Curated annotation (Swiss-Prot):
GO terms for biological process: fatty acid biosynthetic process; lipid A biosynthetic process. Belongs to the thioester dehydratase family. FabZ subfamily. GO terms for molecular function: (3R)-hydroxyacyl-[acyl-carrier-protein] dehydratase activity. This is 3-hydroxyacyl-[acyl-carrier-protein] dehydratase FabZ. The keyword Cytoplasm applies. Its EC number is 4.2.1.59. Keywords: Cytoplasm, Lipid A biosynthesis, Lipid biosynthesis, Lipid metabolism, Lyase. SUPFAM superfamilies: Thioesterase/thiol ester dehydrase-isomerase. It catalyses: a (3R)-hydroxyacyl-[ACP] = a (2E)-enoyl-[ACP] + H2O. Its main location: cytoplasm. It is found in: Cytoplasm.
Length: 155
């Protein structure tokens, strides 16, 4: 990706997301990125459907999206910011830390989750983000996460 492309991308469909992230079904937790503001903020979207494999066991009679997958959606949205800024195809963004995770409300099939991520620190290839997950504007989960860009020849 050119420097111009990395700074002008304002949103990303699933094809662009798959260029930025190595994740694939069933572990790609972001369907679309509706907003990217440089390397500072992004909003990712996950459309939750009952057809997702985790709902067969979590929980069959009352399906609830596992909290760890909400965290993963936040991390993938943050990872898209890192990968976009890095601009080097093939490099990986590793999820390093999670702090202050809180789950406020259940997320169920039919919900549209928005992952709001905001960079609050970057030093070299280490990034720190504050993340919120929202459904219909209501906070359902939040966490502070850390990520690291790893060159493909060092992965």
């Amino acid at each position: 990706m050119t420097e111009e492309a990395t700074t002008t991308l304002s949103s990303a469909d699933i094809i662009e997301i798959m260029k930025l992230l190595p994740h694939r079904y069933p572990f790609l937790m972001v369907d679309k990125i509706i907003e990217i503001d440089g390397d500072n903020t992004a909003i990712g979207i996950k459309n939750v459907t009952v057809n997702e494999p985790h709902f067969t066991g979590h929980f069959p009679e009352s399906p609830i999206m596992p909290g760890v997958l909400l965290i993963e959606g936040m991390a993938q949205t943050a990872g898209a910011i890192c990968a976009k800024k890095d601009g080097q195809p093939g490099n990986l963004v590793y999820f390093m830390t999670i702090e202050n995770a809180r789950f406020r409300k259940p997320v169920v099939p039919g919900d549209r989750v928005e992952f709001h991520v905001r960079k609050h620190k970057q030093r070299g290839n280490i990034w720190k983000f504050h993340c919120d997950a929202k459904v219909d504007g209501a906070l359902v989960a939040e966490a502070d996460i850390g990520a690291m860009i790893v060159r493909k020849d060092q992965a």
